[in-house]
Amino acid sequence: MKLEMICTGEEVLAGQIVDTNAAWFGNTMMEHGIECQRRVTVGDRLEDLVSVFKERSHEADVILVNGGLGPTSDDLSAEAMSLAKGEALVENEIWRERLENWFTRNGRVMALSNLKQAMLPESAIMIDNPVGTACGFAVKLNRAWLFFTPGVPFEFKQMVYEQFIPFVKQRFDIAGDVALRKLLTLGQGESSLADTLEQIDLPSGITIGYRSFMPHIEIKLFARGVGAIAQLDRLEAQIRFLLGNAIVACDRKSLAEEIHSLMVNSGLSLSTAESCTGGMIASQLIDLSGSSSYLDQGLVTYSNESKVRVLGVKPETLDDHGAVSIATVEEMAKGVRSILNSDFALATSGIAGPTGGTDDKPVGTVAIALATKGGVYSQMIKLPRRSRELVRSLSTAVAFDMLRRELLGEAVIVDYGSIGRFQK
């Protein structure tokens, strides 16, 4: 089965919004063993929509169309499909009744423009939208089934799960013969990783891809066919052997999600004292449901005065070593752990830039400490000076990885490679 996606909307085409629906759809399909082989974005122009529907209907088996089902003048998907099919738009009485009931139930007067959402191509199969007013539908044109969904993300996602995937599986033999495995790395550039892995003799049906999203490079293993899928475990073991410390997460988890899983399963607690990362460590964990089971409190102690007053850092430590130092960051970590009585504490202090650097401590110099019941681990790292955001995100990632390694019983301080010079 050949699956494609057509995304609609001037705002998407012009880059005014990021099309997160498309990325989510491709990833979700891959999880179900279905590969989306092409994606096209079209603006809100009737003739362009008609043209692309006709063109792609000769090439694909299934086309998911996203957007353009609302009540306004720029919602043109149903009209374009009727023109491509050469048939009239007709009112779907079931959906009209659903619309009227929805507005009555919510105590609102329905504007007549909403009736547009009940106008479907004559041969269309109505597809339920259980959480919105835009009616989905499916039409067969030439070789392809075109499946229409609203652009509102929560409506779109629910329809994909409840309507689209069952629709496809009822009509096509989906053997799940495509698999994707992801390995998240830290500290090595894309070219360095590619050079290292070039020596691997890839099994037939498997390709390696790379995706850069700082501070990480994601290695993607695509397997097509049952035989290729069976080789994934062996291939992953080879990659882990070659890359060693660079791999920090897998199974499509972010590093924060990896920490989250480990902390929840450990039953232990964590606190943070952040300076240069400005709450980024705590924020990434709080984004995940259930983090309150282990995250006691996150403090942002940005000024020297707050480090002394809140965390108990000695004034003489700051005078003798400076805020960005092993001595200071260790006292920060020990202080917050003692105050909150947590099992672990992470602390950061650094120079994120673009100003504030010196010859001894240039922009990108960051001190990180992990306090545990058994002692304190700390290191000073020198990061690329490309942007303030990069320094903060890399510092957060290294702090997370120190905690991850402690939880797994591995060496906490390691050399990641090209992200900078590390000092214990």
UniProtKB/Swiss-Prot annotation:
Pfam family of the protein (one): MoCF_biosynth
Highest taxon in the source lineage: Bacteria
SMART domains xref list: MoCF_biosynth
Gene3D superfamilies reported in the protein's UniProt record: CinA-like, MoaB/Mog-like domain
Similarity field: Belongs to the CinA family.
Name assigned to this protein: CinA-like protein
Naturally occurring in which organism (per UniProt): Shewanella pealeana (strain ATCC 700345 / ANG-SQ1)
